[in-house]
């Protein structure tokens, strides 16, 4: 194996390891978000369907797009700060940017099956 081939192989290995690490960070972020609850609803923000998007870049900076169940939620700042803190506490995360959006509008179809059962909204 030439030195060029060796460096190329190592580069590919490092890229695969980095991709795997980012996937682990994403899984850990979801676990962290499952510890953040809307103060008015006994379901976490992830299973409630309030998290629309999670992106982790190669610098381990996180972007989250989320919403709330209602635009006039009196606890909006609190919930967003709790999400930011939970994400930034995940090992490997450098920083988190939380973008609160109102489009598309949240509805119960975004909830996980567990959340629907917890709130008695399942159709069984």
Give each language-model segment a name.
Residues 1-124:
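Domain-level signature for proteins that mediate thiol-based redox and metal-cofactor handling
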């Amino acid at each position: 194996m030439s030195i060029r081939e060796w460096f190329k192989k190592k580069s590919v290995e490092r890229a695969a390891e980095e991709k795997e690490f980012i996937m682990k960070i994403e899984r850990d972020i979801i676990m962290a978000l499952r510890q953040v609850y809307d103060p008015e609803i006994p379901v976490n923000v992830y299973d409630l369907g309030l998290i629309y998007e999670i992106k982790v870049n190669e610098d381990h900076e996180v972007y989250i797009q989320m919403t709330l169940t209602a635009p006039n939620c009196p606890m909006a700042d609190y919930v967003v700060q709790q999400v930011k803190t939970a994400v930034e506490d995940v090992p490997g995360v450098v920083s988190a940017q939380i973008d609160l959006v109102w489009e598309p509008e949240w509805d119960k179809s975004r909830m996980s099956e567990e959340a629907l059962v917890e709130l008695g909204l399942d159709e069984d």
